[in-house]
Amino acid sequence: MDNDIPEIKELIRQFSKLPGLGPKSAKRIILKLINNKENMIKPLAKSLAQVYKKVVRCEDCGNLKLIDRICICSSDNSYDKICVVENLADMWVIESANIFKGHYHILGGTMNSNENYEQKNLLIKSLIKRIKKNNLKEVIIATSATVEGQTTAHYIEDTIKNDKIKITKLAQGLPVGLSLIHI
């Protein structure tokens, strides 16, 4: 039997919006939280409130920053290349692999052929400004292999293409050793 307490139902509904969580998983999490109110709900609520109040998206690079501090993109100019990703999770994956040393630029999504970057609030104008301001030599476009990711990559490539900037994209295709019969 489901709970009739509206606050719990609403909490389950809100948790169900998170990626990878359905109503059943959300219920399990809520029950765990309720059974450990002092040790879990209070610190979680405090942390969420702090993030809501203090963390914002940098208008220049799309990374997260504290509202009262300058972003890392403003302070570190020792690199001459930039890696363009769709979202923060993509940047974290590349960063954790420790395979790239340079600037990051988080677009905030992708676009399809029916819309432009301004409609999607993508940070493409600020990317162009950063390339010029920091005299960057290479732009690595690390968008996904989806239609939207490739549409975005082509748009960026067409927008910034010139003789002085090397444009690189992530490798795509068949994994080494995979036979066509397995596709």
Provide a role label for each language-model segment:
Residues P19, E38, V51, Y117, ...:
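Conserved phosphate/pyrophosphate-binding and hydrolysis machinery centered on Walker-type P-loop NTPases
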Residues D2-I8, K17, K27-M91:
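Cys/His-rich Zn2+-binding cysteine-cluster or related metal-binding knuckle/ribbon modules and their
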Residues K166-V176:
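Conserved beta-strand -> loop -> alpha-helix junction used to position metal-binding or nucleic-acid-contacting
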Residues I181-I183:
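Conserved small/polar residues in nucleotide/adenosyl-binding loops
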Residues A26, S74-T143:
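Extended interfacial segments that mediate partner engagement and assembly in macromolecular machines
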Residues E148-K161:
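Short Gly/Thr/Asp-enriched flexible loops that form oxyanion-binding sites at enzyme active sites
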